[in-house]
Amino acid sequence: MTIDTQTEVKAIARYIRMSPIKVRRVLDQIRGRSYREALIILEFMPYRACEPVLKVLRSAVANAEHNEGLDPADLVVSAAFADAGPVLKRFRPRAQGRAYQIRKPTCHITVAVAPGSAE
């Protein structure tokens, strides 16, 4: 696989209300694939994380097309990762005056595309 990382274009979605572990499961499937192949994979995977990842991928390709003048057919997903964001902490009332903490994780999704050929 040959990827030109000099003209790498990326898009970032921040504060997505989803666990980064669950998002990484989806990102591992599209890393290194062509744009067209990644679109097909994301359309048909049964995970909720596919929707924000698909949005970020389309945004990265739009950035490449508009800002760099690259052809979407030649683009390959060169990098895709999810970092942990801040955790929203909530409390659930329990019996006898107690409260359990509920953690609602967020993540930052980054997808980078570059011209190249996927094999």
From Swiss-Prot:
It holds the Pfam family Ribosomal_L22. CDD domains: Ribosomal_L22 (cd00336). Keywords: Ribonucleoprotein, Ribosomal protein, RNA-binding, rRNA-binding. GO terms for cellular component: cytosolic large ribosomal subunit. The keyword rRNA-binding applies. This protein binds specifically to 23S rRNA; its binding is stimulated by other ribosomal proteins, e.g. L4, L17, and L20. It is important during the early stages of 50S assembly. It makes multiple contacts with different domains of the 23S rRNA in the assembled 50S subunit and ribosome. Belongs to the universal ribosomal protein uL22 family. PANTHER family: CHLOROPLAST 50S RIBOSOMAL PROTEIN L22-RELATED (PTHR13501), LARGE RIBOSOMAL SUBUNIT PROTEIN UL22M (PTHR13501:SF8). HAMAP family: Ribosomal_uL22_B. This is Large ribosomal subunit protein uL22.
